[in-house]
């Protein structure tokens, strides 16, 4: 079964699960970079396409809002991670006390973080995982399930977003992390500041972020959702995992053998050879 058939299967199953809920609230105003906006946009498109009615509640109001007959729907996130867990697990705990049910849409989880385990262990919390490693780590905690990341439900081919004529000779778009998610510094390297564009931090809206990717033929990145967008926009993707197997695990589950002609995993030495990264002493 190819990616598109599997996506439809997961989309229909997820919508069926959500439709069983009444008085649905969607969590909004979540902290994150522009890449996270792709998840939120895909989530809204999923709900609208399924004719699911929902109200919105900002993340800052969850702790002080009692909706004992309502369900809170939390968009997928990477904020259950060792590096970023300062707000979302606490939000889940507060919501589990104030809402009848809490559904966490497909996310990645790090169960080495105690507050993550505590939040997912609440009896009325239903977490979805977006890749197999996370699912296997949480399935013993609660009502866990596996599903495609909602970013994959985003429609990149809406009217007005058709591809422009792309210059085949244009240099690849280099998008290497410049935040705490990058381990380049611990290995003595940094992104080449002359050519690196960490668009998840530097663009101001999702449309601009997508346009940056749309207007090239090749993307080199260690950012997950930059990679997802590149693949679904038909670009050549060259990626490296920022830590662990973050992108590799996700791509293996989501894309399987689909798009294998578009996706290439690279190494630090390859990035060095192409001057995409520099030793820190040369970049000081």
Can you describe what each PLM-predicted range is?
Residues 1-284:
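Active-site anion-handling motifs in enzyme catalytic cores
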């Amino acid at each position: 079964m190819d990616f598109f058939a599997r996506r439809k299967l997961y989309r229909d199953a997820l919508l069926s699960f959500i439709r069983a809920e009444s008085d649905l609230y969607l969590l909004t105003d979540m902290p994150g970079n522009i890449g996270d906006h792709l998840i939120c946009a895909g989530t809204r498109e999923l709900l609208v396409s399924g004719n699911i009615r929902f109200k919105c509640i900002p993340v800052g109001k969850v702790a002080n809002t009692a909706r004992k007959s309502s369900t809170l729907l939390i968009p997928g996130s990477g904020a259950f991670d060792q590096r970023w867990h300062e707000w979302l697990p606490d939000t889940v705990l507060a919501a589990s006390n104030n809402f009848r049910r809490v559904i966490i849409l497909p996310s990645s989880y790090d169960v080495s973080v105690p507050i993550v385990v505590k939040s997912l262990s609440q009896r009325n919390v239903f977490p979805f995982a977006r890749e197999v490693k996370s699912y296997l780590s949480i399935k013993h905690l609660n009502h866990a399930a596996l599903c495609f990341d909602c970013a994959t439900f985003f429609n990149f081919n809406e009217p007005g977003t058709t591809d422009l004529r792309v210059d085949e000779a244009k240099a690849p778009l280099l998008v290497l992390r410049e935040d705490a998610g990058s381990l380049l510094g611990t290995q003595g390297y940094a992104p080449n500041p002359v050519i690196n564009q960490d668009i998840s931090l530097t663009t101001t809206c999702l449309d601009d972020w997508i346009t940056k990717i749309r207007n090239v033929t090749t993307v080199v990145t260690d950012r997950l959702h930059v990679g997802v967008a590149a693949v679904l926009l038909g670009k050549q993707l060259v990626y490296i995992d920022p830590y662990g197997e973050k992108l590799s695990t996700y791509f293996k589950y989501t894309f399987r053998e689909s798009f294998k002609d578009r996706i290439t995993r690279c190494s630090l030495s390859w990035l060095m050879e192409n001057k995409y990264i520099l030793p820190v002493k040369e970049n000081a």
